[in-house]
Structure formats: C-alpha cells, structure tokens
Amino acid sequence: MFWKENLQLIMNFEDFDQAYEWFTPRHDPMPFPKMTKAQLRNAVKLFKEDQGARIAYVAEYLSSTSGKDFPTLDDLEQLLRLGRKSMDRTGPEFDDISGTFFSLANDFAFCLCAFLQKYRDDVDWVASKTSKKSGAYNRPLIARPNYETSKGYIDGLQFFLNSLRSSVRREETVDEVMDELKFAIKRNFDIDLS
C-alpha cells in the first residue's frame, strides 16, 4: 500500500504543517541570480553539508517505509504531493505564504540529489556555469560532470516550484508531474525509471 494510503491523505495536512520543521538555508538571504560567484559557491557548499541531516529528518518525519533505501521514487512523489497540498491552500499565484512550500522545495531537492547519487556517483551539487540566457544561470544545480547549458543537470528547487505551480494552473495531477520528473532524469542523467 503506497505509504499507508498517502499518509491518510497527507496526515491531515494542517497537522503535518504544524509539526514540520522548516529547512532554513544558511546561505546569504538573497536570490541566487544576484549572488556573486563566491556567494553561490558557498551556498552550494552549505547545501552539501546540510543534505545528509535534512534527508535523515525527512525520512524520519514522513515515516518512510523505504528504510535505508530512502529516498526512493515513491518518497520523491510523496514530497511533491505534500507540496501540491501546501499550494492548494493559496493557489499558484500566491505560493504558500507559510513557508512550508519553500521548505518542501529544499527537502525535495536534497532528496532528489541523493536519489540520483544512488544511480550515478558522479552527480553532485554544483554552482551553475550556464549562460545568462539559461533559466539555470547562477543557481545551485544537481549535475553530472561536464554538463552543458541545455543538458546534464536538474535545478531541483526550480523543478519543484515551477512544476507544481504549473500543475495547479493546468489542472494536472502529481502523477503527471512525476512523469515530467522521470523524463528529465532520463534526458539529463541517462537513468531510465519507466
């Protein structure tokens, strides 16, 4: 049974939200594109340092049944479902003013990075070196070595934020967002999850 019927429809989301400890990034509080290269490299360094502890918290908090295999594809889906539930409270134009949505985006990105590292040991957080024309310019990316402007990386934070916003506007399901994620993973990392 998938996570006990989706954690009894996300464990009554308000109960989840009250107990969930937000992730607070330790990097400078400014948008990534406005950071200097040194500031972005520091943000990436801090993400790498924080990933293990945050993944352990998420696995325990969500009572994942995947055990030492956490995070699995089902775990990533669960985080997307929580993000969607969070967004449904306010609508895509407002995001989630509580901060839960943005914390879940970070947790999703950490878990996505760890998930990909199980398949490829050359995947890690990197400071973007894509061009200014790229939507991933000057951002922390989950990437393989020698990635290109258009291929070889995923912006885990932006994937979570943009895909869920778009899914609400287009009235798509989380299952469809998962299909997008699998496609992006196959295209960028040559990992077939179908």
Segment roles from a protein language model:
Residues F47, V58-L62, W125, I142, ...:
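Generic hydrophobic, helix-prone segments enriched in Leu/Val/Ile
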Residues S98-E148:
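Amphipathic, interaction-prone secondary-structure segments
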Residues M1-S98, R187-S194:
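The feature captures two recurrent sequence modes
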Residues R81-R84, C113, Q117, R165:
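Alpha-helical repeat scaffolds in large eukaryotic proteins
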Residues T130-S194:
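A recognition module on extended beta-rich or small alphabeta surfaces enriched in W/G with H and D/E
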Residues D15, L40, K118, G152-Y153:
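Short linear sequence motifs
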